[in-house]
């Protein structure tokens, strides 16, 4: 079917779309550049769908299947994606500003240079995700799985990461100033040359973390585990150390 036919089927109604997809398992829908703001796509099967440059602002995608979908340069600001499945989706350059992705599956997504600022991602699974160069300012990432994820050069200013799993994550050159990382599991993570001024690491597992060249001034490390952490060239001015003392 032509691209215009795919869009017509979707606009005819969600039930019609779901029936068509079940009858056409080999079809790869093309909805690129489609204008779909505020559309109700709850539980929709959008797997392997091309939604590049689509406008899905405020769309209802709760529980939707977006596995292997192409959402590069798409706009999903204020969209509802709670418990949606975006496994291995292409999100390069996309905008999820203020979107809700609570409990969503985002394993292995390619989200280079995307914008998740002020989004809600509590308990989402972002294992092995590539978020390099992305905006995550004031994003709620409480309890998320980011193990083995690439967060290099990301902006996580004032982000909420309490109780997150960042096992062996790459956060080199990331901006985590004033971010909250209490009770976080960072074993073997790379935080080299990152900005960590005023970051809250209380009671976190920071063992074997690479902090080379990082700025930890005014950070709070009270109760943190720094066993075998690499602190070469680190700025610890005014940092609260694990025992509660303040570094000169």
Q: Can you annotate each of these PLM segments?
A:
Residues 7-8, 16, 21-248:
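Tandem repeat scaffolds
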Residues 1-2:
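Terminal targeting and flexible regions in eukaryotic proteins, enriched
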């Amino acid at each position: 079917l032509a691209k215009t036919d795919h869009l017509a089927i979707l606009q005819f109604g969600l039930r019609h779309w779901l029936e068509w997809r079940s009858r056409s398992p080999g079809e790869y829908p093309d909805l690129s550049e489609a204008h779909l703001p505020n559309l109700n796509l709850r539980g929709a099967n959008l797997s392997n769908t091309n939604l590049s440059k689509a406008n899905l602002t405020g769309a209802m995608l709760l529980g939707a299947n977006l596995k292997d979908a192409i959402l590069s340069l798409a706009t999903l600001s204020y969209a509802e994606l709670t418990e949606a499945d975006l496994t291995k989706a292409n999100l390069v350059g996309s905008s999820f500003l203020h979107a809700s992705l609570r409990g969503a599956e985002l394993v292995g997504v390619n989200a280079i240079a995307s914008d998740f600022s002020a989004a809600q991602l509590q308990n989402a699974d972002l294992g092995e995700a590539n978020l390099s160069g992305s905006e995550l300012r004031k994003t709620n990432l409480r309890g998320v799985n980011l193990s083995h994820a690439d967060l290099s050069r990301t902006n996580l200013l004032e982000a909420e990461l309490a109780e997150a799993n960042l096992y062996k994550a790459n956060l080199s050159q990331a901006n985590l100033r004033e971010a909250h990382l209490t009770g976080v599991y960072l074993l073997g993570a790379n935080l080299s040359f990152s900005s960590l001024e005023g970051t809250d690491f209380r009671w976190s597992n920071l063992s074997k973390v690479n902090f080379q060249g990082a700025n930890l001034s005014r950070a709070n490390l009270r109760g943190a585990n720094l066993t075998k952490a690499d602190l070469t060239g680190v700025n610890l001015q005014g940092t609260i150390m694990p025992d509660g003392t303040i570094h000169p």
